[in-house]
């Protein structure tokens, strides 16, 4: 599992990203009949083990960072590649994301608790940014405050929309602009 979403799912919240907008992370999980493995480059291994998956029974399998094409050779030592698939087609394996996605649809109780806590933290971030907003602030300033309040709570905003006054009813997804707040504010965080 190489996508950020599947890696987070299989590791109960592990974060394999470097770039927020990348589909795949810098680590992948391989699960076989023989065991579970963390596939990553030599330069990413320390952070992933220390901060993301060290509590899990994943055996680290590393490849040189400058040879990402060498992963299939590493995989061949662990599994029969003719019977191995990937969520994203990583490492030249057949992609079966549609088959992986339903596995994430039903949440276990620890996942429900994490999502409830995330929702509460996100609400606090939005509320703090809105309370700090003042007439004359630009939508961009307010969006930056939402992002900063989110970051303080270990939340990475994927969507940070802000509209002031007449822009609220005009646009369904108002990207923040230099428009200044006069009276009314809309903020959306995902």
Pin down the residues of each PLM region:
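Generic anion/oxyanion-binding catalytic loop in active/binding sites
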Residues: 104, 131, 171
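Short catalytic-site patches enriched in acidic/histidine residues
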Residues: 7, 11-20, 96-100, 137-190
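A composition/biophysics-driven feature that prefers long, compositionally simple stretches
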Residues: 1-127, 139
């Amino acid at each position: 599992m190489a996508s950020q979403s599947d890696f987070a799912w299989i590791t109960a919240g592990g974060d394999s990203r470097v770039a927020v907008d990348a589909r795949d992370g810098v680590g992948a999980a391989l699960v076989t009949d023989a065991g579970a493995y963390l596939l990553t480059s030599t330069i990413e291994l320390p952070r992933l083990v220390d901060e993301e998956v060290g509590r899990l029974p994943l055996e680290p399998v590393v490849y040189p960072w400058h040879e990402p094409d060498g992963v299939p050779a590493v995989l061949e030592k662990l599994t029969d590649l003719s019977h191995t698939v990937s969520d994203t087609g990583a490492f030249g394996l057949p992609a079966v994301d549609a088959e992986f996605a339903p596995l994430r649809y039903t949440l276990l109780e620890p996942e429900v608790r994490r999502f409830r806590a995330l929702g509460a933290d996100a609400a606090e971030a939005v509320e703090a940014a809105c309370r700090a907003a003042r007439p004359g602030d630009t939508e961009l300033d307010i969006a930056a405050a939402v992002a900063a309040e989110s970051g303080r709570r270990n939340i990475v905003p994927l969507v940070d929309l802000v509209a002031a006054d007449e822009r609220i009813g005009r646009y369904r997804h108002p990207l923040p602009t230099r428009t200044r707040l006069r009276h009314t504010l809309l903020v959306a965080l995902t």
